[in-house]
């Protein structure tokens, strides 16, 4: 049987929140927040987003190599609602949302991010097609959300695919790229109250 010894220290009562803590606001502000992890292509490269001091960046870690930054000096951040849906990792490239509202493409390895959408409104939740040629995304402009699509290299003007709902989120492609799905809902509902798939 284990013997438990009583402490010689007097018992101290303090109100909630007044105990000294090693966790300070300064420590929290220095933390790096990991936000999403995706395998690129055949699963040989891990891609993730992280946030530090309010700035988001996108990193890649190929198998057997050191991690490197994909986003350069850009601030990776989805600009719709509470954010989320910041990037889509494909076989040869990644598509990501930047704080300026545009979507950018970056090939793995050497290179720099290139915009694929114009600078108006805000974009989020990019979804790269299985063949890597098209991108679905959520876009908002003047308080109107739509589901849009654009070619993955930005040669064509983005087009509105679906509109009419108040909010859209999480567009995805079928495995063969022949169909798409998304979630939508209207005021006054929240996503957990009343959505359509």
Regions found by a protein language model. Name each.
Residues 29-45, 74-93, 120-135, 165-180:
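Conserved beta-propeller blade repeats
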Residues 43, 154-155, 178, 190-191:
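Short, solvent-exposed loop/turn segments that connect beta-strands within catalytic domains
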Residues 47-71:
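Short N-terminal amphipathic alpha-helices
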């Amino acid at each position: 049987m284990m013997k438990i010894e009583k402490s010689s220290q007097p018992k101290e009562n303090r109100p909630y929140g007044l105990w000294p803590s090693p966790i300070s606001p300064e420590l929290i502000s220095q933390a790096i927040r990991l936000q999403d992890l995706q395998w690129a292509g055949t699963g040989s490269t891990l891609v993730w987003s992280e946030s530090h001091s309010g700035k988001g960046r996108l990193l890649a870690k190929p198998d057997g190599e050191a991690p490197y930054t994909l986003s350069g000096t850009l601030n990776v951040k989805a600009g719709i609602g509470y954010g989320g849906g910041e990037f889509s990792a494909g076989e040869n490239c990644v598509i990501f949302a930047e704080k300026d509202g545009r979507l950018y493409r970056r090939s793995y390895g050497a290179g720099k991010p290139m915009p694929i959408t114009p600078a108006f409104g805000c974009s989020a939740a990019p979804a790269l097609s299985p063949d890597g040629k098209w991108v679905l995304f959520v876009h908002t402009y003047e308080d109107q959300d739509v589901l849009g699509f654009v070619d993955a290299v930005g040669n064509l003007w983005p087009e509105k695919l679906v509109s009419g709902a108040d909010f859209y989120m999480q567009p995805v492609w079928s495995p063969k790229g022949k169909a798409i799905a998304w979630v939508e809902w209207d005021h006054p509902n929240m996503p957990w109250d009343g959505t359509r798939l």
